[in-house]
């Protein structure tokens, strides 16, 4: 089952992306480099729960 997750910027800007993830094939927390438009750079985004 694919669950919705939130990817939060590690730059501390509060910017986030939402996506889905298959928890059965990828049980560990996701970390991916994406573009943060607030600081206008590519930074590390870490998985967080959607509240």
From Swiss-Prot:
Domain of life: Bacteria
Classification via PROSITE patterns: RIBOSOMAL_L33
InterPro entries: Ribosomal_bL33, Ribosomal_bL33_CS, Ribosomal_bL33_sf, Ribosomal_zn-bd
SUPFAM superfamilies per the UniProt record, alphabetical: Zn-binding ribosomal proteins
Signal peptide: none
GO molecular function: structural constituent of ribosome
Keywords: Ribonucleoprotein, Ribosomal protein
Pfam families assigned to the protein according to its UniProt record, in alphabetical order: Ribosomal_L33
Any single biological process term in GO: translation
GO CC annotation, single: cytosolic large ribosomal subunit
PANTHER family linked to this entry: 54S RIBOSOMAL PROTEIN L39, MITOCHONDRIAL, LARGE RIBOSOMAL SUBUNIT PROTEIN BL33M
UniProt similarity note: Belongs to the bacterial ribosomal protein bL33 family.
Protein name: Large ribosomal subunit protein bL33
Source organism: Methylococcus capsulatus (strain ATCC 33009 / NCIMB 11132 / Bath)
